Design a protein with these regions (language model features):
Chain A
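Single transmembrane alpha-helix segments in multi-pass membrane proteins
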Residues: 10-60, 94, 98-112, 203, ...
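Membrane-embedded helix boundary and interhelical linker motif in transport proteins
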Residues: 16, 39, 45-94, 158-161, ...
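Hydrophobic alpha-helical transmembrane segments of polytopic membrane proteins
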Residues: 88-90, 250-274, 315-325, 330
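Transmembrane helix-bundle core of multi-pass membrane transporters
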Residues: 102-103, 111-188, 215, 283-312, ...
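Helix-loop-helix "hairpin" substructures at the membrane interface of multi-pass membrane proteins
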Residues: 21, 160-240, 245, 264-270
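Alpha-helical transmembrane segments within multi-pass membrane transporters and channels
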Residues: 68-120, 269-273, 278, 323-327
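Inter-helical junctions in multi-pass inner-membrane proteins, predominant
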Residues: 5-24, 185-190, 216-262, 279-289, ...
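Membrane-interfacial amphipathic/re-entrant helices at transmembrane-helix boundaries
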Residues: 1-28, 56, 67-79, 106-111, ...
Length: 336, 276, 440
């Protein structure tokens, strides 16, 4: 029995990756939940917006790398991120002007917006593939580890190593900052409050002199920024592939719904719930159990509850269970 | 099926993709404001011989006139379906007024959108969904003052003085308050714009008699500050008792008009609308 | 021009396009009857899927984004019905697998019973947890070794439990049944919730179904694919070695290879047309029947229908199951056409969202619209690529030879496909929101 090593193994294989993935999902889910709360539909193009943001960032990263600009130990992508955000904001605003605004003027039903977002999804997907191709792109550079397994072992003398990738640390730190800024904005600024008011009661917001078009514009800007950050962090941590981003829709939707659609706190909680369930259920617990149980009880198999290919199934099962018991999600939906 | 193909949702009610909570349902008569022009004389606010209906629908109001002057409380009463709320909505620009006019403070505002009427000084409290339930009481008041660019802390203090309970509950979500308190938030929100006239659509709907009396007291208190109040009321008797002016509507027409006392004393009105 | 004429012309347009594909190699056409028939066959299958989705969306407003899953279940049915029986697999572990699955199902049923009949509280949560965890481990204990032994049998070719060795045409209704069963389970859960969460449920289930097909090698060999599935029509090589066929082909003046491929594809086209017409007829009849009128009444005013004592959830479940069954049939037909089951190729863009484009473009609520949309969009889906290349050649014709931009543009032309589908969808939603053939 060796609880310390068990704890390190657990941290290394479950907690750290879970935190990073959870942060990425939370940022994605925040974007979905804001659109749901304020524009009142589920944006199927969100995954592709993330892909677009990541793509613009990657192009700028390559540009910076080619002229020798770097952020030292941090990934160059961080320098490119603001440009990625600006590009995505521009795309979101142009899309809103040319596509969505018409339906607002028509007072179209939310489900029509959902269909429109399908069209936007196809187009964005096409644009991204057209520009950068459907293949895998790696754009991570700089220091690979904050602490590598070998250094950790040397430092502590433990048998198990703990590796924290720079991208993982960066993901969590960025997510914390972004979420803090977002909540400050929504709860403390006049514009943020007007967005919440519009989400709460559109008619009354109008009567209070809040301009819906401005609210919508700010929403798209924030959502574009969130999507880009989430997309870039995910790409840095794993890799960038347009199709993967499209497939992220399911866990992102699941996170937003589990937390309660329209509720930003719920989106964050949902992101971590989904991420940790996926990681824990598809992780092979043999190592951790070997350390924490007496030898006589040590398991023979891998003690993996489900193969990693079933991670979607996990998100979905959690979703159903939550909805069965709390139909509006864990944090009552709708309180942007 | 809806006539507008963009509003045809095939009866879809999927909560995982669409969000209809708090969605806008207002159908203003004008989407863009038209011109206004100065007029001389007349009461402070008047909906003058208004005839009209919703959208392209049939006329609901017929030559209906509603007016209120400074320092007055004017009350619209009448049987169910008489067009009481409709008359007030017409004044607020939610009804297509085909003939007649709405004038406020020496200006013809018939062509304005509801939002622009708020800017011109109309404070409107809808009958339902009249607060931001997920926001705190104080945030509700702040949103009421959204169009103001000056310092509105004084106004907020005045609202708190008028409705002391709101001061205690300022940091509580408005949705958690009782029915009477919610109505106070709603009125307070409308007062935050410093309106020139306050319009209340059935402020006592669904509250207990005790709360109703208290609400009426507050409304009188607001009126004493010189703010004209136009109000639609279901509880005709109590409303007429505090009214300077009363309008009894029947089927979208003015049936009886007079001071509150006159109407209460009118045997015809008593027999038909006040239960003897 | 009357409406009917306009709609007929639209169908004629699609027909002419497919004919041109066979006749001429002008512009983006290939001039190959083979290719024309390939487009026609998948177009017919797409039309059937579109009918299935149209029934759900057009008649009941149900937003199903899991079409891919039902299609894949149809494909699975082909494997399970038509591949030869593998006795060794059944004797070594097949029975245990079935037992394990029954155990798993029983566990779920028990869990549902517990939540239904036990009073809420800590005790219920505890019992529920114990039942679920114990059930899971028992299931895995029976399941894992059985799967191991099944997968060990002749893994290069089989390694799965095989099928029933029945005629492949039986797989089509079986595919429908399999999809219907899955749809019933999903609908029961997602439509029964206090608010309706069908969209996310179908989105998730479809991914799960694909994950199961990809990973459960004992079932359909996973990503190793099942190839050489039995066909309802003769093989081309057999036809080519059949003297009477060769002779007949010669009398038409066609070489035997072309003749045989065209013969087989035309045979499929005929079969698919029969199924399409039958389903279309049934869907039209259902729509005009009292049942269809009730469905539309529910759609147009659910509250009123509920007040009249209609069980809206039950009706929605019915129509969801029916529509999904149709998608399952189409999926089975598709796998039969390909004569292989390749779980790795199922992609929601192609199998779910493209069908939605077909339904919306064709005209939601109109079965003929769905058929038109299915055929038309499928034609574009195939032909946008050569069109894009043509366009890019035109655009880049002025550019310097060997420039990087030119190379990139030409290379990326094939990705125009998704972009164009989105554009078509947006244009139709904007300028003809009821679709090309609107609901009457």
């Amino acid at each position: 029995m060796d609880l310390l090593n068990a704890l390190v193994a657990l941290t290394n294989f479950v907690i750290v990756p879970g935190l990073a993935y959870g942060s990425q999902l939370a940022l994605g889910a925040l974007g979905v939940t804001l659109i749901y709360g304020i524009l009142r539909f589920s944006n199927f193009a969100h995954g592709d917006t993330m892909a677009f943001g990541a793509m613009v960032t990657i192009l700028f990263t390559w540009l910076f790398q080619s002229v020798g600009l770097s952020a030292g130990p941090l990934p160059t992508a961080l320098l490119a991120l603001p440009f990625g955000i600006l590009g995505t904001i521009a795309l979101a605003l142009v899309t809103d002007r040319t596509v969505y605004r018409f339906y607002r003027q028509q007072k179209a039903k939310p489900v029509i917006f959902v269909m429109v977002s399908l069209g936007v999804m196809f187009m964005m997907n096409g644009i991204v593939r057209f520009i950068i191709g459907p293949g895998d792109q790696r754009f991570t550079d700089g220091e690979r580890f904050v602490i590598s397994a070998r250094t950790f072992k040397k430092l502590t003398g433990l048998q198990e190593g703990l590796a924290i990738k720079t991208t993982e640390a960066l993901t969590v730190i960025t997510a914390v900052i972004v979420v803090a800024v977002l909540f400050w904005f929504l709860n403390k600024t006049r514009t943020g409050k007007s967005m919440r008011a519009y989400s709460d009661n559109e008619d009354l917001a109008l009567l209070s002199g809040i301009n819906p078009e401005r609210v919508v514009m700010y929403t798209w800007m924030i959502v574009a920024a969130l999507a880009t950050i989430a997309g870039v962090l995910y790409g840095l941590d794993k890799s960038f592939k347009p199709f993967t981003y499209f497939q992220l829709l399911l866990p992102i939707f699941a996170s937003a719904i589990v937390g309660g659609l329209g509720n930003p706190i719920g989106a964050i909680a949902g992101g971590f719930i989904i991420a940790f369930s996926e990681v824990t259920i598809t992780y092979a617990w043999k190592k951790v159990l070997n350390y924490s149980l007496p030898d006589s009880l040590a398991p023979d198999g891998l003690v993996q509850l489900l193969s990693t290919d079933y991670k979607f199934a996990v998100s979905f099962a959690i979703l159903i269970v939550v909805l069965l018991f709390k139909p509006t999600g864990l944090f009552k939906g709708k309180a942007v | 099926m809806s006539d507008n193909p963009y509003q045809d949702d095939h009866g879809n009610k999927d909560a995982s993709i669409t969000n209809v909570k708090g969605i806008g349902t207002m159908q203003p008569a004008h989407l863009k404001s038209g011109p206004t022009h100065k007029v001389e004389g007349g009461p402070f606010l008047i909906g003058d011989t208004m005839t009209g209906g919703y959208g392209k629908g049939p006329d609901i109001l017929h030559d209906c006139t509603i007016a209120v002057d400074k320092g007055e409380i004017a009350v619209i009463v009448g049987p169910n379906g008489a067009g009481k709320s409709t008359a007030m909505k017409a004044v607020f620009g939610m009804l297509n007024v085909r003939s007649g006019a709405v004038r406020l403070d020496g200006e013809d505002i018939t062509q304005l959108t509801p939002q622009d009427r708020v800017v011109k000084g109309m404070g409107f409290v809808p009958q339902t969904s009249n607060i931001f339930t997920s926001m705190t009481v104080e945030e509700n008041l702040e949103m009421g003052a959204f169009i103001r660019t000056d310092d509105f802390r004084d106004t907020m203090e005045q609202v708190y003085d008028l409705f002391p309970i709101l001061r205690d509950k300022r940091n509580q979500p408005a949705g958690e308050l009782s029915g009477g308190q919610r109505q106070q938030v709603a009125v307070g929100r409308a007062l935050m714009t410093k309106p020139k006239v306050l319009m209340l659509d059935e402020p006592t709907a669904g509250v207990s008699p005790i709360v109703m009396d208290e609400l009426f007291d507050r409304i009188i208190e607001v009126a004493r500050t010189g703010l004209p109040i136009l109000m639609v009321e279901q509880n005709a008797k109590q409303a007429l008792e505090i009214a300077d002016k009363g309008y009894v509507l029947v089927q979208g027409r003015n049936a009886y008009t007079g001071t509150g006392k006159e109407l209460l004393a009118d045997p015809e009105v008593r027999k038909s609308f006040l239960g003897g | 021009m009357t409406e009917t004429m306009k709609h007929t012309l639209l169908f004629v347009f699609v027909g002419v396009m497919i004919l041109l594909e066979g006749m001429t190699d002008f512009l983006f056409f290939s001039g190959s009857w083979n290719s024309a028939l390939v487009i026609l066959n998948m177009g017919l299958i797409s039309a059937i899927m579109a009918i299935g989705v149209n029934i759900q969306w057009g008649f009941a407003g149900l937003f199903n984004v899991g079409i891919m899953g039902f299609t894949a279940l149809g494909g699975l049915a082909v494997v399970l019905v038509s591949t030869p029986v593998i006795p060794a697999a059944w004797s070594s572990g097949g029975v245990s697998i079935v037992m394990a699955l029954v155990m798993g199902a029983l566990t779920v049923v028990a869990a549902v019973m517990i939540t239904k009949f036990m009073p809420a509280g800590k005790l219920r949560a505890l019992v529920l947890a114990v039942v679920l965890i114990a059930g899971f481990f028992v299931y895995r204990a029976i399941f894992d070794p059985a799967v191991g032994s099944v997968e060990a049998i002749n893994p290069a070719l089989q390694g799965n439990i095989g099928g029933l060795g029945l005629p492949v045409l039986l797989a089509w209704p079986a595919g429908g049944l399999l999809a219907a069963g899955a749809a019933w389970l999903i609908g029961k859960t997602a439509l029964g919730l206090r608010s309706d969460y069908l969209a996310i449920a179908t989105l998730g289930i479809a991914e799960i179904i694909i994950a199961v097909l990809k990973n459960e090698d004992w079932l359909s060999r996973g990503v190793k694919n099942v190839v050489g599935l039995p066909r309802p029509l003769p093989y081309e090589v057999d036809l080519q070695s059949d003297p009477s066929f060769v002779e007949r082909a010669a009398s038409w003046g066609i070489d035997p290879v072309t003749a045989s491929t065209v013969y087989v594809k035309a045979g499929y086209a005929l079969m698919f047309t029969v199924v399409l017409l039958a389903l279309l007829w049934m869907a039209q009849m259902a729509l005009k029947s009292p049942w269809g009128r009730m469905m539309r009444a529910i759609r147009d005013n659910e509250t009123a229908a509920e007040a009249m004592g209609k069980d809206v959830t039950r009706r929605h479940l019915q129509i969801f199951v029916l529509g999904s069954a149709i998608c399952g049939i189409a999926g089975a037909m598709m796998t039969t056409l390909d004569s292989q089951m390749t779980p790795g190729t199922y992609n929601p863009l192609r199998f779910t969202f493209l069908i939605w484009v077909m339904v919306i473009v064709g005209g939601s609520g109109n079965n003929f619209g769905a058929v038109l949309g299915g055929m038309l969009i499928w034609f574009f889906w195939i032909k946008v690529e050569p069109m894009g290349i043509l366009l890019m050649e035109l655009v880049t014709s002025g550019m310097a030879e060997g420039s990087a931009l030119k190379a990139h543009l030409l290379e990326s032309a094939s990705h125009m496909r998704l972009f164009t589908m989105g554009l078509i969808l947006l244009l139709v939603l904007r300028f003809s929101p009821r679709g090309l053939i609107p609901e009457k």
